């Protein structure tokens, strides 16, 4: 009877699971769906804008393209390593962070995760709202509000629906980008752009930071969308499906942004939606481009809303000792997260590009140390040998606060501060490096090495296997 009930749950229209463990009987999905989800999430206008920044902020076309690709590969590898944990653990990404930080301690990066995804949702809603407004003939505020309603509905429906829109969005995105590339490249001498090379280490590393931060920013929730895959799914294949989808999608969009900024200049900057739609040769094509822009933002903004509600639920459940949340509480979290991001989008819609640039680069300082700690602990020490019931027990194996991990995390943030270069904060050593921002590199390497050394010296008890809810035995005790 239990298996029948679980089997029915896996086929429900509205997802019944949230922060709790996904039993084997409810596992489903394919690696192809992972690829299309992350391809769709990256074939969108915000990635175009991010790529354009490489040129807008001083880089040439050739070296910007090289740097963006290198950053994609590094950041994409980090992101995909997180994604590969999903099928093995059957848990949301940030719940599993309690293994490293403690049941209460995981709240520290979680609060920042919530802020990040609310910010991403807000910035994406500005661009999507502009497209919806033009498509339906309403003002931008109404366009943002209508887009938010769609996000609420899709987030409530949950995992299956998110993967469905990912599959649809990948098809729409590929068709739209093929058309946009063809229109952009017609009647232009690309060879001249690529031949004009002026290498600058500062611009090169800035471009790398843009694409690496773009990919790493997915890390705190990427496993949320692979956790339903069967437990026997190959980690290597999951890594490739997630990583290739994300890197290919983001690089294609950022390449378009680089060329658009180089060819169109001021006609593109601050007028991104209008420029893209202007590539259409007729009213019908323009309408389809508006639709593709809005739908392109639909996938990733739903991911952000789903991830932010899961993060909020994880924060609250940690202090309440809950292993799951009710449908009513789930709805409250979703409405709260989307309402806040929508209000921010409406309030800040006239200063999007400048604020977004500083936002994405500065947040990287807070997530690279978390990524480093989580990945080193999982791949070097615990693998999938987690005590799932203890993740909700402050008095259990993982405790309330893991002071070692928290200290390494704080050090990982502090070591970056002298090297951060954004519009609202510039580190003391940035000028000595010619304006080069190398903070994210230190934010990965220093915490990884420090946590590895601390974990080797630790006497903590690691289970001999994955301990599931309902099991009385505790391996390793």
Where does each model-flagged region fall?
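Membrane-interface "cap" regions at the ends of multi-pass membrane proteins
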Residues: 1-61, 203-209, 227-237, 458-477
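Hydrophobic, membrane-embedded alpha-helices of multi-pass small-molecule transporters
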Residues: 31-48, 181-187, 197-260, 283-305, ...
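Transmembrane helix-loop boundary segments of multi-pass membrane transporters
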Residues: 55-66, 130-143, 160-169, 275-281, ...
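Helix-loop-helix connectors at the membrane interface of multi-pass transporters/channels
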Residues: 94-98, 125-142, 230, 304-335, ...
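Transmembrane alpha-helical segments of multi-pass small-molecule transport proteins
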Residues: 110-114, 135-157, 171-182, 211-222, ...
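Hydrophobic alpha-helical segments and their helix-loop junctions in multi-pass secondary transporters
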Residues: 138, 171-197, 211-216, 256-263, ...
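Loop-to-transmembrane helix boundary motifs in multi-pass membrane proteins
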Residues: 266, 315-350, 397-416
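C-terminal membrane-solvent junction of multi-pass transporters and transport-like membrane proteins
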Residues: 370-449, 464-466
């Amino acid at each position: 009877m239990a298996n029948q009930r679980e089997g029915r749950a896996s086929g429900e229209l509205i997802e019944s699971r949230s922060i709790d463990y996904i039993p084997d009987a409810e596992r489903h999905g394919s690696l192809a769906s992972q690829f299309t989800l992350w391809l769709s999430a990256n074939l969108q206008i915000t990635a175009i804008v991010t790529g354009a920044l490489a040129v807008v902020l001083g880089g040439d076309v050739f070296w910007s393209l090289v740097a963006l690709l290198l950053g994609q590969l590094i950041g994409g590898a980090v992101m995909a390593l997180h994604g590969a944990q999903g099928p093995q653990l059957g848990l949301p990404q940030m719940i599993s962070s309690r293994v490293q930080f403690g049941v209460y301690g995981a709240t520290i990066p979680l609060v920042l995760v919530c802020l990040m995804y609310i910010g991403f949702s807000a910035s994406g809603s500005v661009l999507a709202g502009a497209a919806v407004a033009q498509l339906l003939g309403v003002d931008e505020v109404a366009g943002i509000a209508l887009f938010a309603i769609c996000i609420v509905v899709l987030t409530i429906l949950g995992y299956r629906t998110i993967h469905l829109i990912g599959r649809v969005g990948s098809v729409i995105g590929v068709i739209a980008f093929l058309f946009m590339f063809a229109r952009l490249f017609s009647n232009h001498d690309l060879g001249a752009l690529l031949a004009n090379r002026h290498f600058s280490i500062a611009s090169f590393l800035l471009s790398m930071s843009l694409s690496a931060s773009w990919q790493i920013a997915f890390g705190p929730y990427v496993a949320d969308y692979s956790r339903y895959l069967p437990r026997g799914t190959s980690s290597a294949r999951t890594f490739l499906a997630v990583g290739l989808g994300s890197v290919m999608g983001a690089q294609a969009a950022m390449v378009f942004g680089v060329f658009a900024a180089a060819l169109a200049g001021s006609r593109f900057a601050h007028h991104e939606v209008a420029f893209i739609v202007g590539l259409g040769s007729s009213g019908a094509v323009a309408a389809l481009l508006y639709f593709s822009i809005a739908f392109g933002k639909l996938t990733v903004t739903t991911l952000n809303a789903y991830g932010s509600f899961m993060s909020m639920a994880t924060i609250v459940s940690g202090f309440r000792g809950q292993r799951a949340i009710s449908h009513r509480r789930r709805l409250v979290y979703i409405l709260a997260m989307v309402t806040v991001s929508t209000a921010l989008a409406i309030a800040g819609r006239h200063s999007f590009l400048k604020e977004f640039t500083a936002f994405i680069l500065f947040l990287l300082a807070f997530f690279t140390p978390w990524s480093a700690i989580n990945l080193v602990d999982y791949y070097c020490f615990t693998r999938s040998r987690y005590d799932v019931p203890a993740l909700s027990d402050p008095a259990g194996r993982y405790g309330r606060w893991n002071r070692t991990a928290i200290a390494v995390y704080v050090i990982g943030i502090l070591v970056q501060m002298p090297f951060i270069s954004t519009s609202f904060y510039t580190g003391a050593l940035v000028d000595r490096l010619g304006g080069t921002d190398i903070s994210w590199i230190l934010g990965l390497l220093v915490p990884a090495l420090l946590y590895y050394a601390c974990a080797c010296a630790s006497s903590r008890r690691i289970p001999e296997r994955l301990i599931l809810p309902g099991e009385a035995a505790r391996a390793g005790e």
